[in-house]
Amino acid sequence: MYFDEEQLLKYTIYAYRLSFFVGICSLFIAKSCLPEFLQYGKTYRPKENSKYSSILERIKKFTVPKAYFSHFYYLATFLSLVTLYFYPKFPIVWIIFGHSLRRLYETLYVLHYTSNSRMNWSHYLVGIWFYSVLLLILNISLYKNSIPNTLNMNAFIIFCIASWDQYKNHVILANLVKYSLPTGRLFRLVCCPHYLDEIIIYSTLLPYEQEFYLTLVWVITSLTISALETKNYYRHKFKDNHVAPYAIIPFII
């Protein structure tokens, strides 16, 4: 079967949208039935493997080092550089490149992952998928000339403020005594202000291309679930002593 260029782009966009639909549905299924898939870092609670464990159980509980987070940003930075080569005059490409490069720097030089800090293999694959499809839809939109080559100043200012705030919050987390309760800044009000920053950062992409609404929905859904996991962990460990009243969005969640 032969597809012309227009059909190929159309079906690629359909596949992009479908992947987010499947991904979001999978999040809720995992939350209800397979919580191990959503745990990482301090919220990851390993269970002893019996020698009689089934192969399926071993696959379900397989983990990788949390330091592999850097792979997400190596990938995003590389794909952004390739996109910059072809579309150097579009501000949104520089914005995504800058975000990827900053997160790579933080992962390598700010955040400190111990050898015991781990995440489920599914979390790792989802990260690779997310940054791949993010750059895929960016390139498709650029190719279709549906993205303006001008800078949205309001969105850019919000992006810069949220990026700076996220960096400062990551510094606080990096300087914590292992698995202690973070304090200061917005940590007094929400357990995961760095997740809130991430949501704000991705919301600033919408003025450039409405297709990014799916990436925003994904970020809101996945990080809200992670923030609720973190809040539950804090409540269990610190018995509600000075735990922030909200998980991610002040006065809402």
From Swiss-Prot:
InterPro entries: 3-oxo-5_a-steroid_4-DH_C, Dfg10/SRD5A3. Belongs to the steroid 5-alpha reductase family. Polyprenal reductase subfamily. It holds the Pfam family Steroid_dh. One of its GO terms (biological process) is polyprenol catabolic process. GO terms for molecular function: 3-oxo-5-alpha-steroid 4-dehydrogenase activity; polyprenal reductase activity; polyprenol reductase activity. Disruption phenotype: Suppression of filamentatous growth, defects in cell polarity, and cellular elongation, due to defects in N-glycosylation. Its EC number is 1.3.1.94. The keyword Oxidoreductase applies. It is a multi-pass membrane protein. Pathway: Protein modification; protein glycosylation. GO terms for cellular component: endoplasmic reticulum; endoplasmic reticulum membrane. This is Polyprenal reductase. It catalyses: a di-trans,poly-cis-dolichal + NADP(+) = a di-trans,poly-cis-polyprenal + NADPH + H(+). The keyword NADP applies. Keywords: Endoplasmic reticulum, Membrane, NADP, Oxidoreductase, Transmembrane, Transmembrane helix. The chain crosses the membrane at residues 18-38, 78-98, 123-143, 200-220. It is found in: Endoplasmic reticulum membrane. Its main location: endoplasmic reticulum. Disulfide bonds: none annotated. It comes from Saccharomyces cerevisiae (strain ATCC 204508 / S288c) (Baker's yeast). Plays a key role in early steps of protein N-linked glycosylation by being involved in the conversion of polyprenol into dolichol. Acts as a polyprenal reductase that mediates the reduction of polyprenal into dolichal in a NADP-dependent mechanism. Dolichols are required for the synthesis of dolichol-linked monosaccharides and the oligosaccharide precursor used for N-glycosylation.
